[in-house]
């Protein structure tokens, strides 16, 4: 039996096409993936992300534990509510998961992990927490709704109470704050402004309906994927996994190398990979007809005249740009052009930074 989120019936009311997503019954779309995509780029859309797992880490050693567990450094978080993104690595520097961590107090951090990796993550976190004075608490009674797009904040403000709006007024990107029963965060997976709202399951249906009443368009996994790919955001299991290190997944910026005496899990392996050199994740753009897809091979000739090969990790048609885009893992020596093999022939592509659309506009 697939898991169902607390919003399952609301999806059916909006005529969602439901699919299995890592053991969860989730909406693929509500009729038109393209319309849902454009709603987020041009107005406001919302996603049920209640399949994500909220984990609270509390105790006197919470900071020390997370500084060991994560490649990014939570000690950088000084202002309550500030969040950071980063990888949780194994001893070989493989990515167990990518996650967001919120600093709430010196003894209270909130971590949001992916649904596909939940059991693995929880087991790893529990194992690594031994010897630290911390309590790790999964919060299954909490649902999550992401409201994204240029008009998302205004439409959400019409739903929040006066006290909630006052609490989050002027909140910068990548912050989260408890406001009444809602934990409201200025994070997202679309490249647009908006909120990710953690809400008690008992209130989730009412919040979803209130947002619907404000004209926020429900959006499914299909649009979520094209939006995140346009924004150059990784999807765990496609763009990286335990066989990939963060340097090869465009996550180098999330590694806190300083201070050098912080011995986070995977550090030694990662330093060796850094010194030896790794593949890298790049963006590909193909302006002629056709769609770049996961697993298609990528070819280029390096400066020494040697043919090199990589692979597409994620590819799609970009509704915002009107042509196909992809992320590909390739040898470091790639230039600004390459070829992709599709339908038994090679097609020329441009190589760009893996960030295609930001705030509705072309980003490369």
UniProtKB/Swiss-Prot annotation:
The glycine cleavage system is composed of four proteins: P, T, L and H. It catalyses: N(6)-[(R)-S(8)-aminomethyldihydrolipoyl]-L-lysyl-[protein] + (6S)-5,6,7,8-tetrahydrofolate = N(6)-[(R)-dihydrolipoyl]-L-lysyl-[protein] + (6R)-5,10-methylene-5,6,7,8-tetrahydrofolate + NH4(+). This is Aminomethyltransferase. Its EC number is 2.1.2.10. GO terms for cellular component: cytosol; glycine cleavage complex. Gene3D superfamilies: Aminomethyltransferase beta-barrel domains, Aminomethyltransferase fragment, Probable tRNA modification gtpase trme, domain 1. Pfam families: GCV_T, GCV_T_C. It comes from Shewanella sp. (strain ANA-3). It comes from the Bacteria. One of its GO terms (molecular function) is transaminase activity. PANTHER family: AMINOMETHYLTRANSFERASE (PTHR43757), AMINOMETHYLTRANSFERASE, MITOCHONDRIAL (PTHR43757:SF2).
